[in-house]
Each structure stands twice: as C-alpha cells, then as structure tokens.
C-alpha cells in the first residue's frame, strides 16, 4: 500500500504542474505545415506543439483529436514567432532563429538544423524576435522585434542584407501583400505600417487605435497580430481583433473576442485561427463563426 501511494504522488504532482502550466500559458505563435494538415503552435515556455488539423476538423473528431500529436522544447525562452517553408519550420525566440525539418518534427527527439542571430548594436543586446516573414520571390526572411527594425536575411547564405527603420517602439508582427509587393508591420506604437520592398521605404500608416469601433483604451494601443490576403487585413492586440479593407483603410468586422490576441492566421480564405492569453487556439470558419478551440 505504501509503495502504491509513493508511486501515485509524483503522478499527481505532475498533473498539478501541467494544469498550472496551462493556466499561465500564452500561445505566442502559429504556423501551418506545407501540406495543410498540421498546425504548429509555440508558447511562453519555449515549447512547440504540433496539432493535426485534419483530425480536429473531421466530422468524427473527439476531444483527443484536439490535443497535440507531439510537443517538444524548441527554445530556452518563449517561442515568439514561427513560419513554414516547403521543407522547414522556422522558429524565433530571444535574439535567435532556428530551423526544423517538417519531415522530422513528428518524430521524438527532433533536432534543430541551424540557428542564426541578427546583427545588434552591442553584444549585450538580445532583443526578442517577435515576427518572421518569408519573401518567396527573394528567397529571404524578414525578422522584427525588440530593436524596432525590420531585418532581412538571405535564406541561401544566412547573411543579413538590410534593415528598415520607422517604428518608434518595438515590433510585434509582420505580414506580406504578395501582389504589391509590400510588407505590413504592427508594433507597440499602435500603428500598422506598409513598406514597399522595391523602394525599401514606408508608404502607408494605419493608426488602428484612433478608430472608435476598434479602440479599447483599457488594453492599450499596441498591435500584437496581423494577417493579410492582399485586399484584406486582420489585426488586433490592444484594439479589438478586426477585419480591415486595405484600399479604403476601413474596418469592416469586429471579432467577438475579449482577450488581447497575440497571433492570427488566414488559410485559403476559409479558416482564421487566433490565439492569445490562454492555452486555446480559436478556429473561425467563414471569417466570423467560431467553430471550435484547440488546447495544449
């Protein structure tokens, strides 16, 4: 009897610890696999969890279908941002970007392929990298975060080629308008800034918090998440999660979510996923109906 109770104690402690972890968890980043069947989500504990979207969206889905297929430790600190290439999952934390093979991720003991650090003013400066953005036509990666700059990295050579300045406070998020081509960035200064990549300069600014229907002064003005399909943009953070028409710079839909959101993703104009200050990833279909939530 004593032996049984001794064996049970650690198990109970583990369950309590995991429950406390979920209670204090923030999902900072998401990325959908190239095949569209899996969703990677990164949290404040440095973990990346891989969910099966095909299983969760199935008509026969059970609660277990909404749990991670695999979870692994990717960074010592929070996983602030992630993005997927045809073969790799790229993740970023405090001052570093790592690459993982999608083909190996579902296996236990997945190891990083490489790690890169942007050039900073001093060796003591290690600002967080809040956002990653792929520019396929240039085969490059844009990184942005705590130093208020947009850094461009050549994915073939691993070298950093330019830095764009404009934000007055640190940057939280990035998105690409492929037709333009323009990059959108959102930051602590409350602005969404549009950058022309060919001219390497800022061409438009939308100060979201100045629109009454979006403004939530008690949450602040910061823009924490951003996504676009070229004609439309979704952004949120301090202001409410809102769908915008970019050409007219007008808000059209306010999503019914109270908590500030840290990440939002479009997928083929059909699915919108949003995550923030909880262990949940909310999934919307038809850009308005909340279908279900995934949980760590």
Predicted regions and their residues:
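Terminal intrinsically disordered, low-complexity extensions flanking WD-repeat/beta-propeller proteins
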Residues: 2-11, 15-17, 28, 87, ...
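Short C-terminal beta-strands that terminate individual repeats in beta-propeller domains
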Residues: 17-22, 60-64, 68-74, 109-124, ...
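Beta-strand-rich domains and repeat architectures in extracellular enzymes and scaffolds
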Residues: 20-46
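Conserved strand-to-loop turn within each blade of WD40 beta-propeller repeats
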Residues: 42-45, 92-96, 102, 137, ...
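WD40-repeat beta-propellers
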Residues: 48-52, 97-103, 150-154, 192-197, ...
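Short loop/turn segments immediately following beta-strands, especially the blade-tip
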Residues: 52-60, 101-109, 197-201, 286-293
